[in-house]
């Protein structure tokens, strides 16, 4: 019996290409909406709502905003029960906030740190929105599936965070 290679399955390549094209279309749509938004808060709202609506694999999308020495939930769509405020000096969300790019955890099962913020299963991706003035917000995308995020999802989160950073009052 001969083993089949991916080249023998053109439908796989076609499906991956269509998925990448769709992701790019959604990204452009969100970037345009961010540019047109009258304020940073409105841009955050549009980004969260559009990401949740367009990507079924995203079980929850949350925007955290910097508030003094902590981060506060600005908007959450279908996020599991968890704190509304977290410190920026400890915990998994704080660690993600200090990163220079998106942070991804592919399996949350058994992670005591993430369970403290309400996420016990699946996977999570967190992208900091920062400017030269510092941290402004975080985009948190949670999926109840393990390994839900691809490198393209990470690039999408990175580009959205960069677009949102341009919308901040300090930009």
Identify what each model region corresponds to.
Residues 1-36, 170:
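Signal-transmission linkers at sensory-effector interfaces
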Residues 23, 28, 32-74:
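Helix-loop-beta substructure at the N-terminus of cytosolic sensory domains
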Residues 60, 126, 138:
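Short hydrophobic/aromatic beta-strand element in the GNAT-like acyltransferase core
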Residues 81-103, 109-110:
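Acidic/proline- and glycine-rich, intrinsically disordered low-complexity segments
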Residues 122-130:
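A short, aliphatic-rich beta-strand micro-motif
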Residues 131, 149-169:
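Amphipathic alpha-helical "output/dimerization" segments
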Residues 135:
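Glycine-rich acetyl-CoA-binding "A-motif" of GNAT/NAT acetyltransferases
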Residues 138-147:
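Short beta-strand-to-loop transition segments that serve as allosteric relay/switch motifs
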């Amino acid at each position: 019996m001969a083993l089949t290679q991916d080249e023998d399955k053109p439908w796989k390549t076609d499906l991956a290409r269509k998925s990448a094209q769709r992701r790019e279309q959604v990204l452009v749509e969100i970037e345009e909406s961010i540019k047109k938004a009258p304020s940073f808060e409105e841009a955050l709202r549009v980004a969260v709502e559009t990401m949740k609506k367009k990507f079924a694999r995203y079980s929850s999308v949350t925007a955290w905003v910097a508030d003094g020495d902590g981060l506060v939930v600005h908007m959450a769509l279908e996020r599991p029960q968890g704190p509304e405020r977290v410190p920026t000096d400890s915990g998994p969300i704080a660690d993600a906030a200090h990163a220079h790019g998106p942070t991804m955890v592919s399996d949350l099962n058994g992670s005591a740190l993430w369970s403290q913020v309400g996420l016990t299963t699946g996977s999570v991706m967190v992208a900091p929105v920062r400017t030269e003035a510092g941290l402004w917000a975080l985009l948190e995308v949670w999926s109840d599936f393990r390994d839900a995020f691809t490198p393209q999802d990470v690039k999408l989160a990175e580009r959205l965070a960069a677009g949102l950073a341009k919308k901040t009052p300090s930009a």
